[in-house]
């Protein structure tokens, strides 16, 4: 099987639009990893296996070779497709912080969706903004998706209040963070990257979230459903989808609205 060398990969990344690059990557991966033992709901690919991922490639079968989705992305992709009304169409607006390439191209194609990407410093997004000071009026967005951002934000409580403020009463948000402790650990005086790595798990993290994370969301006025991966995927599909069984989706609404009742009812 032909292999794509590193120089060719760099040339492709520089010379092709993101959507075309993802398409070529998917076709190549499906040929190289031909099989059905694994399925990626983020890009709808059937594969023989996933590949190692993580900063030190220490998580076997973490990454989809076709689209780059990690365990958390595959869980969110499944939730969006099978549990939410994201793909239902209709005139709605969506705010996506720190957009992942695997989702951005899909969301842009949803009929009727006024899709906005945002980040503090990434020049590729549509609007550069501070998540703790969102420059939009109250009750502006129908959907908000923000994954693995809040652990980088010094005042996450203010950021969560802002997310709640700009969400319509009928809307919903998925606000994901890595949860790796019993209780949230934070100390704003710690600025040394190595000390942050030791205490918070990454040099640019300012806290380590615990299982009390939903309490922060609720303190800002959100109604929160912490939905386990097994509840979303079903025990039989966890391994094939390459999903972390300990992961949860944090589904938030500004009040007990129709979509909250629908999702809550599915949880039983």
Language model features by range: what are they?
Residues 143-144, 163:
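Alpha-helical membrane segments in multi-pass integral membrane proteins
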Residues 25-38, 154-163, 168-268:
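S-adenosyl-L-methionine-dependent methyltransferase catalytic module, highlighting the catalytic core
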Residues 147-152:
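Short catalytic micro-motifs in class I SAM-dependent methyltransferases
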Residues 97, 144-145:
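Hydrophobic beta-strand segment of the Class I
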Residues 2-135, 235-268:
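Conserved N-terminal segment of class I S-adenosyl-L-methionine
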């Amino acid at each position: 099987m032909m292999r794509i060398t590193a120089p060719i990969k760099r040339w492709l990344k520089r010379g092709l639009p993101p959507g075309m690059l993802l398409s070529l990557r998917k076709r190549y991966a499906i040929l190289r990893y031909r099989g059905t033992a694994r399925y990626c709901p983020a890009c709808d690919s059937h594969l023989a296996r996933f590949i190692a991922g993580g900063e030190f490639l220490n998580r076997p079968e973490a990454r989809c070779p076709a689209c780059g989705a990690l365990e958390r992305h595959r869980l969110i992709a499944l939730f969006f497709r099978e549990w939410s009304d994201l793909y239902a169409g209709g005139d709605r607006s969506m705010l996506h912080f720190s957009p992942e390439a695997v989702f951005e191209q899909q969301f842009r194609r949803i009929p009727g969706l006024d899709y906005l990407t945002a980040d503090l410093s990434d020049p590729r997004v549509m609007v550069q903004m501070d998540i703790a000071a969102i420059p939009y009026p109250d009750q502006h967005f129908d959907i908000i998706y923000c994954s693995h951002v809040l652990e980088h934000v010094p005042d996450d409580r203010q950021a969560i209040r802002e997310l709640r403020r700009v969400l319509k009463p009928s809307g919903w948000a998925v606000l994901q963070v890595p949860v790796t402790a019993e209780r949230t650990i934070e100390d704003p005086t710690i600025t040394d990257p190595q000390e942050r790595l030791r205490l918070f798990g990454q040099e640019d993290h300012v806290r380590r979230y615990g299982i009390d994370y939903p309490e922060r969301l609720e303190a800002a006025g959100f109604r929160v459903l912490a939905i386990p991966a097994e509840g979303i995927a079903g025990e039989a599909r966890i391994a094939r989808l390459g999903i972390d069984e300990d992961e949860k989706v944090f589904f938030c609404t500004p009040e007990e609205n129709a979509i909250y009742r629908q999702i809550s009812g599915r949880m039983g």
